[in-house]
Amino acid sequence: MFQGLSPLARDARAWPFEQARVLLARILRLRLSDAERDLASVLIHSGKADEAVRTFPALAKPVILETGYGPSGLPHLGTFGEVARTTMVRNAFRALTDDAIKTRLIAFSDDMDGLRKVPDNIENKQPLIEDLGKPLTVVRDPFGTHDSFGAHNNARLRAFLDGFGFEYEFVSSTDCYKGGLFDETLLTALARFDAIQKVMLPTLGEERRASYSPFLPISPSTGKVLQVPTLERDVDKGTIVFQDEDGSKVEVPVTGGHVKMQWKPDWAMRWTALGVDYEMSGKDLIDSVKASGQICKALGGVPPEGFNYELFLDENSQKISKSKGNGLSMEDWLRYGAPESLSYYMFQSPKSAKKLYFDVIPKATDEYLQQLDAYPKQEPAKQLDNPVWHVHSGRPPQYGSPVSFSLMLNLVSAANASDKEILWGFLSRYIPGATPQSQPLLDRLAGYAINYYEDFVKPSKVFRAPDDKERAAMLDLLGRLKALPSDCQDAELIQNEVFAVGKDHGFDPLRAWFQALYEVLLGQSQGPRFGSFAAIFGLDRTTALIAEKLAV
């Protein structure tokens, strides 16, 4: 699927390809000598990446891209965005290297973190209250479906990612700590304790500095993750000594899941132990990335490539907060728009702040449909810069939707459609042979449009009477439309008539004429091309609607 694309990918301007080129440069720089790197670059850039891998065995090792998840809560829009964007970079890298250099995308769950507070949206809070401070994979599951609260939320994450068709490998922090995967790097961290402290202590307040340790021991007596000072260290034995909650001094190994690391050192340790090559993160973590990068170097690793994406804002340009409940939830978007439109939205300018509220859904949906329609008409080089190539992992569907989402919304509004069957009565007449089976995307859009109309458009509809100038123009339009064949579905012809009426009646700008039509006929201030609406709604119904609003 990605083979044969390297000559085009080399010059593609879409941001995932920019990131992929940075990632490839890293792989060549870290794995090969200067002479080897020059030859490998020539081979890869000439479409012979498979030969480069055969020639240089170091390139056979998979490139690792990572995303992180905190399983104290459920997956959300940020989770989706990070996995979707990382997948886009992965696919761009695969195209850049003709899929010859293997890749892995790790979805890493920080499920050994201690439970800090009880989520508000859980009814059965008592088990969580009793287990506060314990690792999430030890906290009892309040839903009674899994071995732990962490296991429950991990299952939700996997179901979430599987539902969107992401290709990934799930990795549990608990498994890595307890299974020994992190042991070697943890011992290195113990040996380089002072170097880690040198990075971390300047970032902390005076009180926190006095007690800070990069190691968080698991209390043998209570099972809680403890934020306590490290009293003694024995590098040869691989142990630390701390004061337990009962006041006793306890010595534990840093290996085998007896401790976990504070999150910034933990991030660095994970990068080092897993050999992570790429990880992106939000703009709010810029300082954390810097600190973790320094610690990663202290541990003998190389910090991954990546970039900091901007955070989402609500309609008032305020940062979206789960606790405030402003902005959109994952469930909100998927009630009113297709997952593809959400992926499209995530693709757009990740380094620019974007508002995330309900009004963006129709716009994102229609822009996605426009790009999908343009894709088959584009040259191959342009296709790689088309967002739908990235949304669909290089395989956009052959067919989009012959009707825009905004037009569908107007159709729902005019027809007072409460179910898809009513809409299909119009759609099947406008698009010969169209059925929900032959036009699955159109059928899904119909459902989204009904939901959006019922929840947002219908409650805010405000009809008004036309003024004298508008009334005269609408009567003129009524006469002209009635003069057309009643079965006319020529959207361009109808649009020309509407345009001519507005011009003849002196509307300047003409936008005021179209706005008047929507406000008088549909109770809203804007909509798609009126000719397209009339063609799909039906000329007879359109003229009847005009006559009804003019009371003629």
UniProtKB/Swiss-Prot annotation:
<dbReference type="GO" id="GO:0005524">
    <property type="term" value="F:ATP binding"/>
</dbReference>
<keyword id="KW-0030">Aminoacyl-tRNA synthetase</keyword>
<dbReference type="InterPro" id="IPR002904">
    <property type="entry name" value="Lys-tRNA-ligase"/>
</dbReference>
<feature type="short sequence motif" description="'KMSKS' region">
    <location>
        <begin position="319"/>
        <end position="323"/>
    </location>
</feature>
<feature type="short sequence motif" description="'HIGH' region">
    <location>
        <begin position="71"/>
        <end position="79"/>
    </location>
</feature>
<keyword id="KW-0436">Ligase</keyword>
<keyword id="KW-0963">Cytoplasm</keyword>
<keyword id="KW-0648">Protein biosynthesis</keyword>
<dbReference type="InterPro" id="IPR001412">
    <property type="entry name" value="aa-tRNA-synth_I_CS"/>
</dbReference>
<keyword id="KW-0067">ATP-binding</keyword>
<dbReference type="GO" id="GO:0004824">
    <property type="term" value="F:lysine-tRNA ligase activity"/>
</dbReference>
<dbReference type="InterPro" id="IPR008925">
    <property type="entry name" value="aa_tRNA-synth_I_cd-bd_sf"/>
</dbReference>
<protein>
    <recommendedName>
        <fullName>Lysine--tRNA ligase</fullName>
        <ecNumber>6.1.1.6</ecNumber>
    </recommendedName>
</protein>
<feature type="binding site">
    <location>
        <position position="322"/>
    </location>
    <ligand>
        <name>ATP</name>
    </ligand>
</feature>
<dbReference type="GO" id="GO:0000049">
    <property type="term" value="F:tRNA binding"/>
</dbReference>
<comment type="similarity">
    <text>Belongs to the class-I aminoacyl-tRNA synthetase family.</text>
</comment>
<dbReference type="Pfam" id="PF01921">
    <property type="entry name" value="tRNA-synt_1f"/>
</dbReference>
<dbReference type="InterPro" id="IPR020751">
    <property type="entry name" value="aa-tRNA-synth_I_codon-bd_sub2"/>
</dbReference>
<keyword id="KW-0547">Nucleotide-binding</keyword>
<dbReference type="InterPro" id="IPR014729">
    <property type="entry name" value="Rossmann-like_a/b/a_fold"/>
</dbReference>
<dbReference type="GO" id="GO:0006430">
    <property type="term" value="P:lysyl-tRNA aminoacylation"/>
</dbReference>
<dbReference type="GO" id="GO:0005737">
    <property type="term" value="C:cytoplasm"/>
</dbReference>
